[in-house]
Amino acid sequence: MKREILLERIDKLKQLMPWYVLEYYQSKLAVPYSFTTLYEYLKEYDRFFSWVLESGISNADKISDIPLSVLENMSKKDMESFILYLRERPLLNANTTKQGVSQTTINRTLSALSSLYKYLTEEVENDQGEPYFYRNVMKKVSTKKKKETLAARAENIKQKLFLGDETEGFLTYIDQEHPQQLSNRALSSFNKNKERDLAIIALLLASGVRLSEAVNLDLRDLNLKMMVIDVTRKGCKRDSVNVAAFAKPYLENYLAIRNQRYKTEKTDTALFLTLYRGVPNRIDASSVEKMVAKYSEDFKVRVTPHKLRHTLATRLYDATKSQVLVSHQLGHASTQVTDLYTHIVSDEQKNALDSL
């Protein structure tokens, strides 16, 4: 997400928050926490405080009016009710057949709340040099962390990767086979964004960039001749990322129709666009997630854009056997994160031997 857009969204959330959350924000900004982290925390607080109002724990008219005493007097039972609410609420994503958010999402929410409670009960000082209150209910709330070995994780992930010929096969399917299954109306809709969709998916498969890094690319960030993109990594760090050659024709096809198809002006700097009511806008992450889910489910198995990142990393490690190279490609500071791909490749090698 572009810094200016991120700051705009942070400001909107800050306008909703109680004064003690705003103090927390300023304190963590001085650490410094990244704007991305603080934005994610503010979204979690918005979700929590909205539930506080809906459940009647506070009779305040709006989130900004919720008094500090509500957090001070929050019981363990109240917090467990919030966790149950998260587990049972309908999912707001492309897969609507499941109920409740994942344990990973719940842990992220509780982590944000734990950070806020620690600040209020230990870190902040009032005029007397004391914290605002001492009772930290979050210390009584248990979180369940998913435990699995790298080998187990590799086994779970590898079925959702497009390895070997499946990378090009996936792109060919979208380009040639998927349209044959569509009604005339659906085909018309597909053709409007066919080149863009293929370019995005090809880029994800050929570079391994994160979804946020891809959707925030500007036209000037793509060097088609050198097959390099300039991205903004986590922590707002700029990085140059090599792109595999197989993505080039898909990017060229998209660029050939981009200006006319999406009615661009000079001010439309985003690389990947969507057209809404005749006005071009930067495509958002949610749209790409739904697009990848739709195409991948029809092709083989429903996956997320992050699985396309795993696909590139696994293929690159298989070709080079270099964790350092894979780490650099993914933008990781350590090779520890790439240990997963050694296990996936080992399984692939075993399967190859078994087939001899």
Curated annotation (Swiss-Prot):
Per UniProt, activity regulation is: FtsK is required for recombination.
Name any GO cellular component annotation.
Answer: cytoplasm
GO BP: any one term: DNA recombination
Q: Which SUPFAM superfamilies does this UniProt record tie to the protein? A: DNA breaking-rejoining enzymes
InterPro entries, per the entry? CB, DNA_brk_join_enz, Integrase-like_cat_sf, Integrase_catalytic, Integrase_recombinase_N, Integrase_SAM-like_N, Recomb_XerS, Tyrosine_recombinase_XerCD
Residue ranges of domain Core-binding (CB) in the record: 16-121
Q: Where in the cell is it found?
A: Cytoplasm
Q: Where is the Tyr recombinase domain?
A: 169-354
Keywords noted in UniProt? Cell cycle, Cell division, Chromosome partition, Cytoplasm, DNA integration, DNA recombination, DNA-binding
One protein family per Pfam: Phage_integrase
Active site feature = 210, 234, 306, 309, 332, 341 (o-(3'-phospho-dna)-tyrosine intermediate)
Q: Which GO terms describe its molecular function?
A: DNA binding; tyrosine-based site-specific recombinase activity
User: What is the top-level taxon of the source organism?
Assistant: Bacteria
Q: What does this protein do?
A: Site-specific tyrosine recombinase, which acts by catalyzing the cutting and rejoining of the recombining DNA molecules. Essential to convert dimers of the bacterial chromosome into monomers to permit their segregation at cell division.
In the record, the note on similarity to other proteins reads: Belongs to the 'phage' integrase family. XerS subfamily.
For this entry, the protein name equals: Tyrosine recombinase XerS
